[in-house]
A protein has these predicted regions:
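Alpha-helical residues within the helix-turn-helix
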Residues: 18, 29, 58
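Short alpha-helical DNA-recognition segment
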Residues: 21-40
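Residues that mark the N-terminal boundary/hinge immediately upstream of a DNA-recognition element
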Residues: 23, 49-52, 63
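Short C-terminal boundary/hinge segments that cap the last helix of small helical domains
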Residues: 61-71
């Protein structure tokens, strides 16, 4: 069973990425993470590190604290 926080986090990434009209591939290239890894995060299949959370937030142009406000 997937953890709820991972689901919310993945949804937040997808939502913010789509707001910027970025494909998974374009976003992955922008931040230096493999496209399949982005997909796994968005599908709540990965529990990622703080360093990668920072990369995601920076790539989306938002602060880590705002990024972590999960609803």
């Amino acid at each position: 069973m997937k953890e709820e926080i991972l689901i919310k986090f993945g949804n937040k990434i997808r939502q913010e990425r789509l707001k910027q009209n970025l494909s998974q591939e374009a976003f992955a290239d922008k931040i230096g993470i493999h496209r399949t890894y982005i997909g796994m995060i968005e599908r709540a299949e990965k529990n990622i590190t703080l360093l990668n959370i920072k990369k995601l937030a920076d790539g989306l142009g938002i602060s880590v604290s705002d990024f972590m406000k999960l609803e």
